[in-house]
Design a protein with these regions (language model features):
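Interfacial segments of multi-pass membrane proteins
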Residues: 1-2, 30-35, 58-62, 80, ...
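Membrane-embedded alpha-helical segments of multi-pass transporters/permeases
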Residues: 55-56, 86, 122, 139, ...
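Alpha-helical transmembrane segments of multi-pass membrane proteins
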Residues: 43, 76-81, 117, 121, ...
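Membrane-helix interface "capping/anchor" motifs
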Residues: 87-90, 119-133
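Multi-pass membrane catalytic core of lipid/isoprenoid biosynthesis enzymes
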Residues: 30-59
Length: 186
């Protein structure tokens, strides 16, 4: 009678034991806002600080580049977050890193892109939609503010976000993606 009932759902797993690293962060209690909120805030703070540090370092290392130093510092933070060498190139999806970078590089319009993506999440309930929208909106904004090089780098970032959130977008299309703020969307 001490044996577990195999018909019951599996209990939540720790992040390191997840089979799919893309799902690990998405389903972790800290990132989903349920359960370990303090851990989630620490992860968010770490993402914000490492992105700010990367941008600051590039600004200090090459001040003659001006805003372009922030452009490449942020891209480095996004790449390092999504594919960290110390974790066998398996990382997160980069939403907080991307938002921080946009706000540092395009302070007002970057914040508006983030707000638009957040609004899409609140209205639809789908996190992948907001994540991809944030990065996609930044491409024309960067073009208008700083030109082609900036737009190209933002397009690279948008492509990364699309790739990292592709599975969630496909689940959305099939009606299988869980909705964030589910209680608001019945």
């Amino acid at each position: 009678e001490g044996a577990e009932d195999p018909s019951q759902e599996n209990p939540p797993q720790d992040i390191p034991s997840q089979e799919d690293p893309d799902q690990a962060g998405t389903n972790s209690e800290g990132s989903s806002g349920s359960g370990l909120r303090a851990a989630g805030f620490l992860v968010l703070a770490g993402d914000v600080l490492k992105t700010a540090a990367a941008c600051w370092f590039c600004w200090q290392a090459a001040p003659e580049l001006g805003h372009t130093a922030l452009l490449y510092g942020g891209l480095g933070a996004v790449l390092g977050h999504n594919w960290p060498f110390w974790n066998k190139f398996r990382g997160g999806k980069g939403v907080a890193v991307n938002c921080t970078w946009l706000i540092l590089y395009l302070p007002i319009t970057g914040a508006l892109c983030c707000l638009a993506g957040g609004g899409a999440v609140l209205l639809s309930g789908y996190l992948p939609l907001g994540a991809v929208l944030i990065a996609a909106l930044a491409v024309p904004v960067a073009w208008l503010q700083y030109g082609g090089e900036s737009a190209f780098i933002m397009a690279v970032s948008a492509s990364i976000m699309l790739t990292r959130h592709w599975a969630g977008l496909q689940r959305m299309r099939r009606g299988e993606e869980p909705q964030f703020f589910r209680k608001w969307h019945y």
